[in-house]
């Protein structure tokens, strides 16, 4: 009977969910019972699903937060804007300011250079917003 109780406890722990942002490299991809599309996908997953996703070379975990953490924090930025802004700022900081392919004559980062270094397309408005957020 105690073995059954232990198995039940294991099943209960596998049902603990977290919210994860998963980046998919393919147009459509299915793993761990979840359908993903190219780009970032915000999904609710169990710890078992998260382990399967972490082991997959087509998917990468951008972030993962337990349900308790989200409740304490007051929610999740479902659009991932804060995370994207942080990544844009880090990318711009890593560009060569002396390289005319990276920056305009006025000192603005070029969209093409930021998108290439970031590994995903971003707009001029997104870059400006990310940099303005850092100045605020």
Curated annotation (Swiss-Prot):
Annotated protein name in UniProt: Uncharacterized protein gp35
Domain of life: Viruses
Aminoacyl-tRNA synthetase as UniProt keyword: no
Membrane spanning residue stretches: none
Organism: Escherichia phage Mu
Conditions for induction: Expressed in the late phase of the viral replicative cycle. Expression of late genes is activated by the viral late transcription activator C.
Keyword tags: Host cytoplasm, Late protein
Keyword Hydrolase: no
A Gene Ontology cellular-component term: host cell cytoplasm
Subcellular location(s) per record: Host cytoplasm
């Amino acid at each position: 009977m105690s073995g059954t109780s232990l198995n039940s406890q294991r099943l209960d722990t596998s049902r603990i969910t977290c919210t994860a942002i998963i980046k998919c490299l393919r147009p459509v991809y299915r793993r761990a019972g979840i359908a993903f599309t190219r780009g970032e996908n915000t999904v609710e997953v169990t710890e078992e699903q998260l382990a399967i996703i972490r082991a997959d070379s087509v998917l990468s975990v951008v972030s993962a937060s337990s349900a308790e953490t989200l409740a304490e924090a007051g929610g999740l930025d479902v659009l991932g804007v804060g995370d994207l802004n942080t990544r844009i700022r880090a990318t711009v900081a890593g560009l060569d300011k002396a390289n005319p392919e990276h920056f305009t004559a006025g000192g603005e980062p070029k969209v093409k250079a930021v998108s290439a270094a970031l590994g995903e397309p971003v707009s001029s408005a997104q870059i400006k917003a990310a940099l303005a957020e850092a100045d605020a």
